[in-house]
A protein has these predicted regions:
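Ordered alpha/beta subdomains of enzyme catalytic regions
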Residues: 1-152
């Protein structure tokens, strides 16, 4: 499976089916992405991962292979699986610009989408932001510690 849309916590899928089954799939929801601690016990974080998030969302879909895998688990009903096979992101994402200094517990990305899509995006977007910000912050820290001299 090369499709990254399946990159989610299992409970996100079961929650999405719950929204679907309860008739709440089309409700517009918002969720914020934030982080709890600065990397390396530092005083700040630089936002990162936005390009990866944009690419992930642009390519967000469940293909035949992913649907067949989910079907094999015998947990998800056929109506929900059919819905997933046609799902596309039709929402909005608001984010602080790449490289912005950000601090713990403040929203850095806001997602507006239908309840099912928002639920399914959460894990991957958190992973992309956290990894991207870790790398961006580490690079800035390394550059700063070298004080203009080429570091080994």
């Amino acid at each position: 499976m090369n499709n990254k849309s399946i990159m989610t916590d299992f409970y996100e899928l079961t929650m999405a089916q719950t929204y679907f089954d309860s008739g709440k799939k089309d409700e517009e929801v918002y969720f914020d992405i934030f982080f709890r601690n600065n990397p390396f016990n530092g005083g700040y974080t630089l936002s990162g991962g936005l390009e990866e998030i944009i690419n992930y969302v642009k390519n967000f879909k469940y293909g035949e292979e992913e649907i067949n895998y989910l079907r094999s688990l015998k947990i998800f009903n056929e109506k929900f699986l059919n819905y997933l096979s046609n799902l596309e992101f039709k929402g909005d994402i608001y984010a602080v610009p790449e490289g912005t200094v950000v601090f713990p517990n403040e929203p850095v990305i806001t997602v507006k989408a239908d309840a099912v899509t928002a639920q399914l995006l959460e894990t991957a977007l958190l992973a992309c932001f956290n990894h991207g910000s870790l790398v961006t912050t580490a690079a800035k820290s390394r550059k700063h510690s070298c004080n203009g001299v080429r570091c080994p």
